[in-house]
Every structure is written in C-alpha cells, then in structure tokens.
Amino acid sequence: MINGSFRKYLEEAIGSDNALVAFSAFESPAPSSIRCNPFKSGICPEGRPVTWNAYGRILPERPVFTLDPHFHAGAYYVQDSSSMFVGHAFRRLLESAGKPVGRPFRVLDLCAAPGGKTTDLAASLREVFGDGFILVSNEVMKARAGVLADNVALWGDPNVVVTSDDPRAFAALPGFFDVIVADVPCSGEGMFRKDEEAQRQWSEDNVALCEARQRRITADVWPSLRQDGLF
C-alpha cells in the first residue's frame, strides 16, 4: 500500500497519469540484476543485457547469491539496473576527460556504502586510465564502512582506498579531486518495491531533513573539488 502522503505529493508533482505509472511499478516485483566484474571474466551468470551498462545483466530469477562461490570471489556485484546509470554517466564523462599530467586522475565517492557505485566507477577508471587513477571510497557510518571495505576487497582493484570520514574532513584537500560523486542521503522512494517499511516511514518532514543534510554535505565537501571539476 502506497503511503497516502507520498501519493498526494507525487500526484501534485508529476500529475495523476504519470503518478499512476509510478504507483504500478512500486507494486510490481523488483527484477534481480547484477553487474559483472570485467577483470574476473568468464564466471558471471548469464542474463538479459542492461542497455546502459555493458557489464549489467538482468537475471530471469533471483538466485541464492550467498550459495554461489563466484559471488564470494567478486565475479559480480548485485545491483539494481537503475543504479548502474550512474556508471553510464561517469563513462560518458571519462570519454572527454583529459589525462592529468604528472599525477593520477582523482575521484571521490563520498557516500559510498555498500559499494555499488565504487566498483562501477573503478571498472571505468581502470579501462580509461589503466593504473593512473585513485578512487577514494568514503562512508561516514562506521558499520556501513565495514561492508564497503569488504565489497571493495572482493572487487579487487588496488587503486581504491576506503575511508570513513565526515565530509568536512575533505576540505583539508582543497582542489584535490577531479570528480566527486555524492549519493547523498535521500527519502528512499527507490526502496518502496523492496521494503514496505520504507513506504510507511516516508514523510514530508523526512524529505526536509534529507534536504538539509544534502546541503550540508555538499557545502562541506565542495572545497576539495578542483576548479572546473565535476560534482
């Protein structure tokens, strides 16, 4: 059952017809998808290709991933296909990015847990720059940072560094990063199909709280972005 406050909000925001399409999607089962690790080829499950990600696969059914040794070997990462679009946009950026002279290309994934974006970014950076990049993968919440570190270790790229710092700490590195990716805290509508509790907890007050957090995080980390860098 869709949260009544959210239903009213979305109908006013995008119109009743468009909202009806969204509500229908929320009520349908979520497909299961994975993104293969290009550097551990040949051991990725088969599936329907994801249009916007060369390594994405939509599976015919959801297996028990924890029983698959390939999952534990980092051969693939379980990720919603929609979340892979961040990697698609990042790859398009790298197509036009020049290689820095005398230093690696530097990227910060600021709100990185559990690691989906980081592993996707790492694959693209490795393809474009070879060993000439560094990706800082940060998660401020200590418990989630542990999960992030585990997933990064499974992925196996040595140019990824995991940290657990408040965004304001990166202001000590003025103009350091060429790109900052920030999946800032949000009100979680993307979880509605997976978690009924996420629907029940939605409120305009929570949206306002998330907005304030987003503004604070962005302002705190902004000094660490180089001039003409991309946020």
Language model segments and positions:
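S-adenosylmethionine
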Residues: 1-231
